């Protein structure tokens, strides 16, 4: 029986780098570049359609404005990450998406592009903070059919 994750490593498909602009995401690009120099990559930033606060806005036009702003931020963040990845030595393009939950958006794009692997940084949340905020990297790893490289934060 064929393992789709293993097959993905054999193909010459792009990496998917999840990028949110954080130090962990920047480090993930650096690690991806050192492991896969010159590789094609899609740098993905995922934003929520609207936040709870935004959803409480009274008019449809206001909510629609928030959705457009969130999409714009995702596109800008992805472009920033792609520029960083290109400077580091990958052949990267940015992509912004709107999805809830974030991890599902990452997996959807990985499937769409046939990613070789998913690379992402970790925010290293623990305890109560992780229970309240969740861990996108853990959810991606748990549900993925692709290899997932979770890059830990730099040690102090």
Stretches found by the model and what they are:
Residues 34, 111-112, 142:
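Solvent-exposed polar/charged
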Residues 42-44, 93-97, 149:
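General small-molecule cofactor/ligand-binding pocket signal
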Residues 61-76:
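A short acidic, glycine-rich active-site loop
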Residues 1-10, 83-118, 156:
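Structural beta-alpha unit
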